[in-house]
Protein backbone atom coordinates (compact mmCIF):
# COMPACT_ATOMS: atom_id res chain seq x y z
CA UNK A 1 0.00 0.00 0.00
CA UNK A 2 1.11 3.54 -0.73
CA UNK A 3 1.53 5.71 2.39
CA UNK A 4 -1.43 8.04 2.80
CA UNK A 5 -0.61 11.76 2.91
CA UNK A 6 -1.79 13.60 5.98
CA UNK A 7 -4.63 16.04 5.45
CA UNK A 8 -6.29 18.63 7.64
CA UNK A 9 -8.67 15.99 8.97
CA UNK A 10 -5.75 14.06 10.44
CA UNK A 11 -4.70 17.10 12.42
CA UNK A 12 -8.15 17.44 13.97
CA UNK A 13 -8.23 13.74 14.82
CA UNK A 14 -5.04 13.73 16.86
CA UNK A 15 -5.52 12.97 20.52
CA UNK A 16 -3.12 15.47 22.08
CA UNK A 17 -4.22 18.93 23.18
CA UNK A 18 -2.18 21.98 24.16
CA UNK A 19 -3.82 24.78 26.16
CA UNK A 20 -2.92 28.46 26.23
CA UNK A 21 -4.50 30.49 29.04
CA UNK A 22 -4.24 34.28 28.94
CA UNK A 23 -4.15 36.36 32.12
CA UNK A 24 -4.50 39.99 30.90
CA UNK A 25 -3.30 41.88 33.98
CA UNK A 26 -0.13 43.93 34.53
CA UNK A 27 1.17 46.34 37.12
CA UNK A 28 1.81 48.68 34.20
CA UNK A 29 2.24 48.33 30.45
CA UNK A 30 5.81 47.92 29.21
CA UNK A 31 6.89 50.39 26.53
CA UNK A 32 7.23 47.71 23.83
CA UNK A 33 4.20 45.55 24.62
CA UNK A 34 1.15 45.27 22.35
CA UNK A 35 -0.40 42.25 24.10
CA UNK A 36 -3.84 42.55 25.64
CA UNK A 37 -3.20 43.63 29.23
CA UNK A 38 -4.26 46.27 31.73
CA UNK A 39 -4.15 47.02 35.47
CA UNK A 40 -6.93 45.39 37.47
CA UNK A 41 -8.56 45.49 40.87
CA UNK A 42 -9.11 42.35 42.91
CA UNK A 43 -12.78 42.47 41.86
CA UNK A 44 -11.78 42.54 38.19
CA UNK A 45 -9.43 39.61 38.67
CA UNK A 46 -12.12 37.58 40.43
CA UNK A 47 -14.65 38.37 37.69
CA UNK A 48 -12.15 37.35 35.01
CA UNK A 49 -11.37 34.09 36.76
CA UNK A 50 -15.08 33.27 36.99
CA UNK A 51 -15.46 33.89 33.25
CA UNK A 52 -12.33 31.83 32.56
CA UNK A 53 -13.68 28.90 34.58
CA UNK A 54 -16.92 29.05 32.60
CA UNK A 55 -15.02 29.02 29.31
CA UNK A 56 -12.89 26.08 30.46
CA UNK A 57 -16.07 24.11 31.12
CA UNK A 58 -17.44 24.90 27.68
CA UNK A 59 -14.22 24.19 25.81
CA UNK A 60 -13.67 20.91 27.64
CA UNK A 61 -16.89 19.54 26.14
CA UNK A 62 -15.54 20.22 22.65
CA UNK A 63 -12.33 18.30 23.34
CA UNK A 64 -13.50 15.49 25.58
CA UNK A 65 -11.58 12.96 23.46
CA UNK A 66 -8.25 14.76 23.84
CA UNK A 67 -5.49 14.49 26.44
CA UNK A 68 -3.78 17.69 27.54
CA UNK A 69 0.00 17.37 27.14
CA UNK A 70 0.98 21.01 27.58
CA UNK A 71 -0.39 24.13 29.27
CA UNK A 72 1.05 27.63 28.93
CA UNK A 73 -0.28 30.37 31.22
CA UNK A 74 0.76 33.70 29.71
CA UNK A 75 -0.20 37.33 29.75
CA UNK A 76 -0.11 39.99 30.81
CA UNK A 77 1.41 38.94 34.08
CA UNK A 78 -0.06 35.66 35.38
CA UNK A 79 2.08 35.93 38.53
CA UNK A 80 -0.12 38.83 39.67
CA UNK A 81 -2.69 36.18 40.56
CA UNK A 82 -2.54 34.71 44.04
CA UNK A 83 -1.33 31.20 44.74
CA UNK A 84 -4.91 30.33 45.65
CA UNK A 85 -6.23 31.56 42.30
CA UNK A 86 -3.64 29.56 40.36
CA UNK A 87 -4.50 26.53 42.49
CA UNK A 88 -8.19 26.97 41.66
CA UNK A 89 -7.35 27.34 37.97
CA UNK A 90 -5.32 24.15 37.91
CA UNK A 91 -7.99 22.27 39.86
CA UNK A 92 -10.62 23.36 37.34
CA UNK A 93 -8.48 22.25 34.39
CA UNK A 94 -7.84 18.85 35.98
CA UNK A 95 -11.56 18.44 36.69
CA UNK A 96 -12.59 19.25 33.12
CA UNK A 97 -9.79 17.83 30.95
CA UNK A 98 -7.94 14.54 30.74
CA UNK A 99 -4.33 15.31 31.67
CA UNK A 100 -1.20 13.45 30.61
CA UNK A 101 0.84 12.43 33.65
CA UNK A 102 3.93 14.13 32.22
CA UNK A 103 2.14 17.27 31.01
CA UNK A 104 4.38 20.35 30.91
CA UNK A 105 2.65 23.21 32.70
CA UNK A 106 4.37 26.56 32.18
CA UNK A 107 3.58 29.87 33.82
CA UNK A 108 5.06 33.26 33.01
CA UNK A 109 6.48 35.06 36.05
CA UNK A 110 7.68 38.64 36.25
CA UNK A 111 10.10 39.78 38.97
CA UNK A 112 8.44 42.27 41.26
CA UNK A 113 5.15 40.35 41.35
CA UNK A 114 6.04 37.23 43.35
CA UNK A 115 7.30 36.21 46.77
CA UNK A 116 8.95 33.00 47.93
CA UNK A 117 5.63 31.90 49.42
CA UNK A 118 3.73 32.58 46.20
CA UNK A 119 6.27 30.58 44.19
CA UNK A 120 5.88 27.65 46.59
CA UNK A 121 2.11 27.88 46.14
CA UNK A 122 2.47 27.85 42.34
CA UNK A 123 4.62 24.73 42.60
CA UNK A 124 2.14 23.03 44.92
CA UNK A 125 -0.68 23.90 42.50
CA UNK A 126 1.02 21.85 39.79
CA UNK A 127 3.03 24.39 37.81
CA UNK A 128 6.19 22.52 36.79
CA UNK A 129 7.90 25.03 34.50
CA UNK A 130 8.48 28.77 34.94
CA UNK A 131 9.27 31.35 32.28
CA UNK A 132 10.85 34.34 34.02
CA UNK A 133 10.88 37.69 32.21
CA UNK A 134 14.36 38.98 32.86
CA UNK A 135 14.79 40.75 29.46
CA UNK A 136 18.09 42.42 30.44
CA UNK A 137 20.61 42.59 33.27
CA UNK A 138 21.29 46.29 32.61
CA UNK A 139 19.53 48.85 34.80
CA UNK A 140 19.20 51.50 32.08
CA UNK A 141 17.85 49.03 29.52
CA UNK A 142 15.24 47.75 31.99
CA UNK A 143 14.24 51.34 32.74
CA UNK A 144 13.86 52.09 29.03
CA UNK A 145 11.63 49.03 28.64
CA UNK A 146 9.39 50.16 31.48
CA UNK A 147 10.11 47.07 33.58
CA UNK A 148 9.46 47.19 37.33
CA UNK A 149 12.46 45.09 38.41
CA UNK A 150 16.25 45.24 38.42
CA UNK A 151 18.80 42.45 37.96
CA UNK A 152 19.08 41.85 41.69
CA UNK A 153 15.31 41.42 41.88
CA UNK A 154 15.44 38.89 39.06
CA UNK A 155 18.21 36.94 40.82
CA UNK A 156 16.14 36.79 44.00
CA UNK A 157 13.12 35.42 42.14
CA UNK A 158 15.29 32.88 40.32
CA UNK A 159 16.85 31.70 43.58
CA UNK A 160 13.48 31.46 45.31
CA UNK A 161 12.02 29.53 42.36
CA UNK A 162 14.80 26.94 42.62
CA UNK A 163 14.28 26.73 46.39
CA UNK A 164 10.54 26.24 45.83
CA UNK A 165 11.32 23.09 43.83
CA UNK A 166 11.29 24.22 40.20
CA UNK A 167 13.80 22.30 38.08
CA UNK A 168 12.60 23.52 34.67
CA UNK A 169 13.06 27.28 34.26
CA UNK A 170 13.20 29.44 31.13
CA UNK A 171 14.71 32.93 31.16
CA UNK A 172 13.63 35.55 28.60
CA UNK A 173 16.18 38.06 27.29
CA UNK A 174 15.85 40.69 24.56
CA UNK A 175 18.16 42.20 21.94
CA UNK A 176 17.90 45.34 19.84
CA UNK A 177 16.89 47.46 22.84
CA UNK A 178 17.18 51.24 23.09
CA UNK A 179 20.66 52.07 24.34
CA UNK A 180 21.83 48.45 24.11
CA UNK A 181 25.32 47.65 22.85
CA UNK A 182 26.95 44.40 21.86
CA UNK A 183 28.94 44.56 25.10
CA UNK A 184 25.87 45.07 27.29
CA UNK A 185 24.01 42.24 25.53
CA UNK A 186 27.00 39.94 26.00
CA UNK A 187 27.11 40.88 29.68
CA UNK A 188 23.41 40.04 30.07
CA UNK A 189 23.89 36.68 28.37
CA UNK A 190 26.94 35.84 30.48
CA UNK A 191 25.06 36.66 33.67
CA UNK A 192 22.28 34.26 32.65
CA UNK A 193 24.78 31.52 31.83
CA UNK A 194 26.38 31.91 35.26
CA UNK A 195 23.14 31.45 37.18
CA UNK A 196 23.21 28.52 39.62
CA UNK A 197 21.83 26.19 38.52
CA UNK A 198 21.95 27.24 34.88
CA UNK A 199 18.43 27.62 33.42
CA UNK A 200 17.14 24.73 31.34
CA UNK A 201 16.13 27.10 28.55
CA UNK A 202 16.92 30.63 27.38
CA UNK A 203 14.54 32.47 25.03
CA UNK A 204 16.28 35.30 23.16
CA UNK A 205 13.91 37.70 21.43
CA UNK A 206 14.66 40.65 19.18
CA UNK A 207 12.71 43.83 19.89
CA UNK A 208 9.92 44.56 17.43
CA UNK A 209 8.50 48.07 17.56
CA UNK A 210 4.78 47.36 17.39
CA UNK A 211 2.18 49.87 16.23
CA UNK A 212 0.30 51.59 19.03
CA UNK A 213 3.01 51.16 21.67
CA UNK A 214 4.95 53.95 23.43
CA UNK A 215 8.05 52.80 21.54
CA UNK A 216 6.24 53.31 18.22
CA UNK A 217 5.31 56.85 19.19
CA UNK A 218 8.89 57.54 20.24
CA UNK A 219 10.20 56.13 16.95
CA UNK A 220 7.89 58.42 14.97
CA UNK A 221 9.32 61.40 16.86
CA UNK A 222 12.88 60.19 16.30
CA UNK A 223 13.36 59.62 20.03
CA UNK A 224 14.05 55.87 20.07
CA UNK A 225 17.84 55.22 20.02
CA UNK A 226 17.92 51.68 18.64
CA UNK A 227 21.30 49.96 18.11
Give, region by region, the residue ranges found by the protein language model.
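Short active-site neighborhood of thiol/selenol oxidoreductases, capturing the structured segment around
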Residues: 19-22
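Single conserved hydrophobic/aromatic residue that forms the stacking wall/gate
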Residues: 1-12
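C-terminal scaffold of the Radical SAM
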Residues: 10-17, 37-61, 66-227
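Local cysteine-cluster metal-coordination motifs and their immediate loop/turn environment
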Residues: 24-35
